[in-house]
C-alpha cells in the first residue's frame, strides 16, 4: 500500500516553479516586513559567501539554518530585516586569481600591475553570483538579494 504518491522530477519542478512564482508575485518577503509596522526589530545580516567558487552543501545548510531563525523570529512577531552579503576580498580570492593567471608570488603580481590584479580580483568574486542567487531563491530563503552589502564597497568599509 503506497502512502504517498510518487512524483516525477518534472512534477516537482512544475510545483517548485509555481510556488516560487507565487512568492515572487505576491512579494511575500516585503509583506512579512510591512505587516509588522510597529513590531520590535530583529536585523539579520547573512554572513557573506565568496561567489568566486561554486556553492557547496555547507553554504546551503548554513542558509537553511539562518533562514529558519529569521522565519521563527517573524512568527514570534518581530519585524525581521534580512540582508545578504558578498565577501569580495581576502587571501582566498587573491590566491585563486594568482592560480588562474599562473602566478607564483608577489613579483608576478607587481609585474602584472597591482591595479590590474585588484580589478581581476573584483571580477572574479562575481563569477558565481547568479548560481548563489538562484539557489537562494529555489531553497525559499526569504532575504533581500537585490540590495546586498559588499565587503569591497566603501559604504561597507566605512
Residues of each region from the PLM?
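N-terminal, positively charged nucleic-acid-binding surface of large information/translation enzymes
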Residues: 1-158
Amino acid at each position: 500500500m503506497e502512502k504517498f504518491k510518487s512524483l516525477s522530477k518534472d512534477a516537482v519542478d512544475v510545483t517548485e516553479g509555481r510556488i516560487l512564482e507565487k512568492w515572487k508575485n505576491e512579494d511575500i518577503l516585503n509583506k512579512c516586513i510591512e505587516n509588522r509596522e510597529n513590531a520590535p526589530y530583529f536585523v539579520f545580516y547573512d554572513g557573506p559567501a565568496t561567489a568566486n567558487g561554486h556553492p557547496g552543501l555547507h553554504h546551503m545548510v548554513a542558509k537553511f539554518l539562518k533562514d529558519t531563525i529569521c522565519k521563527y523570529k517573524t512568527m514570534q512577531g518581530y519585524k525581521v530585516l534580512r540582508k545578504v552579503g558578498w565577501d569580495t576580498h581576502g587571501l582566498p580570492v587573491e590566491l585563486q586569481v594568482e592560480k588562474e593567471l599562473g602566478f607564483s608570488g608577489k613579483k608576478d603580481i607587481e609585474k602584472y600591475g597591482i591595479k590590474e590584479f585588484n580589478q581581476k580580483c573584483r571580477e572574479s568574486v562575481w563569477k558565481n553570483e547568479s548560481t548563489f542567487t538562484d539557489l537562494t531563491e529555489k531553497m525559499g530563503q526569504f532575504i533581500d538579494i537585490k540590495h546586498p552589502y559588499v565587503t569591497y564597497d566603501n559604504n561597507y568599509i566605512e
